[in-house]
């Protein structure tokens, strides 16, 4: 059967599938575009299913604010190269927008995108088209009230995105400065009053042990550690950290200077954070490909 270049072009335009896949689909579907689309989708779901167990630790984060809501989102791919793919970038943008539209970051996979498909189904289609596992990893929505402000910052082409909810009305520049602090310094807590007790107890125990190993008398170890904990808390608590643009003041002082009271919430997503990446052996990969 002769397959015209125009039909292949039309099918590629509608599905984003590769040239040979489109040609094969038309051959298997008697040159019928609609049947070919269905064939590609069926084969695509099969391909996507095979990718389901793959580790996707690359991708992109984004932070978007609209009105009284702000979303921080991470979408993963298997390689950094794919994270720059136009269809992938559009998917990230569309997911962020639909979260803001629905004012909810719960059950993101079930939200319906402008293409009339759910986020989950669109991710499957992308996985089949691009050839890598695509998945929405996490999303968090912040909502502000009267007298509150957002601060947003995206670093290194979406490698890190951060947002803060500030108690007080500040300029977008001040808000961005605080979000930038979160992105660059990666604080664990907003302030010392929010420090997790279990984390603090474990850190104190480790410091006491280290202090004793350094040869300090056991009876003085706790006093020494108390001073070290004060220093550590200043490092891990956002409001107590020295401002990266002016080490002479802390973040809380910077906020006070700008008529704000405190930081209420902070969110920081870094691509692949906490995901154990598979270290592929090149020779093994070649052998695996040869067996296919």
Curated annotation (Swiss-Prot):
Q: Which organism is it from?
A: Malacoplasma penetrans (strain HF-2)
Q: Where in the cell is it found?
A: Cytoplasm
Q: Which family does it belong to?
A: Belongs to the EF-Ts family.
Query: What is the stated purpose of this protein?
Result: Associates with the EF-Tu.GDP complex and induces the exchange of GDP to GTP. It remains bound to the aminoacyl-tRNA.EF-Tu.GTP complex up to the GTP hydrolysis stage on the ribosome.
Alphabetized, the UniProt keywords read: Cytoplasm, Elongation factor, Protein biosynthesis
Q: Where is this region: Involved in Mg(2+) ion dislocation from EF-Tu?
A: 79-82
Q: Which PANTHER family match?
A: ELONGATION FACTOR TS, ELONGATION FACTOR TS, MITOCHONDRIAL
Name recorded for this polypeptide: Elongation factor Ts
One function term, GO molecular function aspect: translation elongation factor activity
Please provide one cellular component term from the Gene Ontology annotations of this protein: cytoplasm
